[in-house]
């Protein structure tokens, strides 16, 4: 006959966050000693950390606080949509914003209720039994930011997040900046202007364009012009200000921003599980 009750199991689950089966086993092992059962579960959680470290965390969410955006990963979408996980991520995002965290290392070191975010993460990981990761953080400079968070389905937290730092006044400016954030989420611009594209990337694209053009048998004298045209195509696909706007395909993003008196100074895009 068990020397513990269903109420003991419930209380132990609420206190430790462990599963029902683990709580029952701990109470059996402790012969109903509640405090010892708590200790058993804490030891089990610590041992499980090593096992969890070998698993992949490719689900999760993107959270934003002020000018700061973070990505926190979990193993399953079941945990990603858990209210405790979302609350944990929100608290870390607030701490990251206060510290202006701008890298994974800085994110892991921010203070969350008197402990580092990494330490808080490990405790929470032991509680829920899944590998969790503080993936990355970015903080944009500027007084104004537009935010767009995209959910892949209504029951899941945001999996894509975009922050846009901008200057401009009024509702029209704010709407245009948010539209730019939505554009970045959808079309995945990598650069703000063509001047931001690294020289080695340009040379690589130029080389590929020239190789393709030659293989097509184009006249030698026409090759430079065709290559430049293809390079411009690369810019229009990858440079935000040169993309055709999803809101008005007849205009570039730059044209619509100019109409609203907006200057985008920087942006960042996170997608859960992606580089």
Swiss-Prot record:
- Localized where? Cytoplasm
* Keyword Oxidoreductase set for record: no
A Gene Ontology cellular component where this protein is annotated is: cytoplasm
Q: InterPro entries under this entry?
A: EF-Ts_dimer_sf, Transl_elong_EFTs/EF1B, Transl_elong_EFTs/EF1B_dimer, Transl_elong_Ts_CS, UBA-like_sf
One Gene Ontology molecular-function label: translation elongation factor activity
The region called Involved in Mg(2+) ion dislocation from EF-Tu is annotated at: 76-79
Q: Does the keyword Cytoplasm apply?
A: yes
* One matching Pfam family: EF_TS
This protein's major location comes to cytoplasm
Q: Cite the CDD domains for this sequence.
A: UBA_EF-Ts
Q: Which domain of life is it from?
A: Bacteria
Keyword annotations from UniProtKB, A to Z: Cytoplasm, Elongation factor, Protein biosynthesis
Q: Which family does it belong to?
A: Belongs to the EF-Ts family.
PANTHER family registered for this protein in UniProt? ELONGATION FACTOR TS, ELONGATION FACTOR TS, MITOCHONDRIAL
Q: What does this protein do?
A: Associates with the EF-Tu.GDP complex and induces the exchange of GDP to GTP. It remains bound to the aminoacyl-tRNA.EF-Tu.GTP complex up to the GTP hydrolysis stage on the ribosome.
Q: What is this protein called?
A: Elongation factor Ts
Organism (species): Corynebacterium glutamicum (strain R)
In the record, what lineage is assigned to the organism producing the protein? Bacteria, Bacillati, Actinomycetota, Actinomycetes, Mycobacteriales
